[in-house]
C-alpha cells in the first residue's frame, strides 16, 4: 500500500492503457508487462483509490489483460476492513469478483453488463457517479510524461516510476 491513513470508506478501482515507446521493448519478456495489439505495444495500470481520489495501490499488467483477471489481486492489496463499498465499472462485472469482495465483508457497487440476467437493483447510482475520482487520479498520473508513455524496458522500473508519481499526488495534500 502506498499510504496508511487513507479514507477507506469507499474504494474505487479501474484500469487504464499506457502506450509503450517503441524502444521500451527488448528486455526479458517475463519481466516486461508489455503486450502487442492492433493499437501497438501497451501496458495497463490497475489502480485503487480512496474516497478522496488518492492512489492506494496499483498493479501493472500487459495491455491485453482484462480488468477482471487482475481485480482479485488488486482487492487483496487493499485493507478492506473499514471499507463499506468497493465501486468499479462494468468491466469488473463477475460473480467470482463479487464473491471475493463479499469475503472481505464489503459491499460491491458494480453495475451488471447488459447481457446479464440479473438486475441492477443493488446499485447506488449516486455513489457510482463519484467513481470519476479514479478517472481523475489517472489524469493526474498521466500528467507525468514518464507515466503517460512507458519508456522503461522492465516492469520493475516502470512500477517505481508509477509509485513515485502516486507519491507526488499524495504530497500535494
Regions found by a protein language model. Give the residues of each.
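Short, charged, surface-exposed secondary-structure boundary motifs
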Residues: 117-123
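A generic, residue-level signal for flexible/boundary positions that often mark functional hotspots
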Residues: 7, 28, 122, 145-148
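Basic, amphipathic alpha-helical segments enriched in Lys/Arg and hydrophobic/aromatic residues
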Residues: 99-100, 104-106, 124-173
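Polybasic low-complexity intrinsically disordered regions
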Residues: 1-113, 126, 165-166
Amino acid at each position: 500500500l502506498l499510504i496508511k491513513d487513507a479514507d477507506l470508506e469507499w474504494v474505487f478501482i479501474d484500469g487504464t492503457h499506457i502506450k509503450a515507446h517503441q524502444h521500451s521493448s527488448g528486455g526479458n519478456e517475463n519481466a516486461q508487462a508489455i503486450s502487442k495489439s492492433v493499437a501497438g505495444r501497451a501496458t495497463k495500470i490497475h489502480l485503487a483509490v480512496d474516497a478522496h481520489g488518492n492512489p492506494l495501490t496499483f498493479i501493472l499488467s500487459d495491455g491485453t489483460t482484462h480488468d477482471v483477471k487482475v481485480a482479485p489481486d488488486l482487492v487483496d492489496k487493499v485493507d478492506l476492513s473499514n471499507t463499506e463499498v468497493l465501486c468499479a465499472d462494468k468491466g469488473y462485472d463477475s460473480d467470482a469478483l463479487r464473491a471475493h469482495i463479499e469475503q472481505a465483508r464489503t459491499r460491491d457497487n458494480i453495475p451488471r453488463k447488459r447481457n446479464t440476467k440479473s438486475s441492477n437493483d443493488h446499485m447506488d447510482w449516486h455513489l457510482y457517479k463519484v467513481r470519476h475520482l479514479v478517472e481523475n487520479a489517472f489524469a493526474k498520473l498521466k500528467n507525468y510524461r514518464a507515466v503517460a508513455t512507458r519508456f522503461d524496458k522492465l516492469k520493475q522500473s516502470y512500477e517505481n516510476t508509477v509509485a513515485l508519481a502516486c507519491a507526488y499526488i499524495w504530497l500535494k495534500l
